[in-house]
Design a protein with these regions (language model features):
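Periplasmic POTRA and POTRA-like interaction domains that precede
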Residues: 12-39
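Basic, Lys/Arg-rich alpha-helical nucleic-acid-recognition elements, primarily the DNA-binding modules
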Residues: 42
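Peptidyl-prolyl cis-trans isomerase
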Residues: 1-10, 17-20, 48-320
Length: 320
């Protein structure tokens, strides 16, 4: 990272010729704050994340997201990718719609007008467009085996508990041995003739009690290896993982619909990987700087008249 100096009014950071401004940061921050609060409530901001507050974590995410949009716009310049007139019109209409949804307090808090919002939507659209440009020829063939999705029921006997902050606390050796003994007893019951595995799940499992469909690389390695080696209807031996002891029953060794969906997911992951490699190499050489004084002065908004969270929803309504 190469640092420069000197900032314009309301300029929070610079990346080469691109600037991230206070109104842009506030639009991202307010929308993300309201989305979190609508799901988790205001108490989410009291949570400690290994010495960092949730509010600081969200601020850092906002900064990273906006900085990436700016860097991707520079990448678009490198590839001569631009918005066409229809896309610019969509950005203008999206900005008008979002601005009209705001009340006076929200406009004042975020310091926005239609011109600023139009630029934000244009830059966000261009970032997405350069992503699509770079990955347009990435269409790998994914085999059924690579994308295979299986369906299981399982019983989990945990070997940990959690503290008040949600952090895992490992069981003592004595408690782990008790958990193992319980799991072994349940396994014996599961393999008895006429045993109802689902009833044992409901009675004993300390994990999710629903049916679980998954593909390779989506769960703990020991669990995956044991499950993928089962035949339909077969019950595993005891599977030990960092989470605890599992007993797995295979319901289906090949879920056609889920496997097809997983192929789409794997292709997208490979495209993201290709883009990430080019983006990371490009971004490493960019000159950037942050206005520390202004950045430190930015905080979450505590105002009952501020509740907007539709900025990105409106974008997707216009751009898909």
């Amino acid at each position: 990272m190469v640092l420069t100096g000197g900032f314009a009014r309301n300029e929070v950071f610079k990346i080469e010729s691109m600037s991230g401004t206070l109104p842009e940061i506030m639009v991202y921050l307010v929308n993300m704050q309201e989305q979190y609060e609508s799901v988790y409530g205001k108490e989410i901001w009291q949570r400690d994340l290994n010495g960092t507050t949730m509010s600081e974590s969200v601020k850092d995410t906002v900064l990273a997201n906006l900085a990436q949009v700016k860097a991707m716009n520079l990448l678009a310049q490198k590839h001569n990718v631009t918005l066409d007139e229809m896309e610019k019109q969509f950005a203008k209409e999206a900005a008008e719609e979002y601005y009209e949804s705001l009340n006076e307090t929200e406009i004042a808090v975020m310091q926005v007008n239609e011109e600023i919002l139009t630029q934000m939507y244009e830059e966000y659209a261009l970032a997405n467009k350069v992503y699509e440009y770079i990955i347009k020829d990435i269409n790998p063939e994914i085999s059924d085996d690579e994308a295979r999705t299986i369906t299981v029921d399982y019983i989990l006997i945990k070997t940990y508990t959690t503290d008040g902050t949600g952090e895992k606390i490992e069981y003592s050796e004595e408690d782990k041995n008790e958990a193992r003994s319980l799991a072994e007893d349940i396994l014996r019951q599961a393999k008895e003739e006429g045993s109802d595995f689902k009833e044992l799940v409901l009675k004993y499992s300390e994990g999710d009690k629903g049916t679980y469909s998954f593909g390779k690389g989506e769960t703990e390695e020991a669990f995956e290896q044991a499950a993928f080696n089962l035949a339909t209807g077969e019950i595993s031996s005891l599977v030990e993982t960092p989470s605890g002891f599992y007993i797995i029953k295979c319901l289906s060794t090949f879920d056609k619909d889920q496997t097809s969906a997983n192929k789409v997911k794997i292709v997208e992951e490979k495209r993201e990987e290709v883009f990430g490699e080019e983006y990371d190499a490009f971004a490493q050489g960019l000159t950037r700087d942050i206005n520390e004084k202004l950045w430190k002065s930015i905080s979450l908004v505590d105002d009952e008249n501020v509740s907007t969270q539709q900025f990105f929803d409106i974008y997707h309504n216009y751009f898909g």
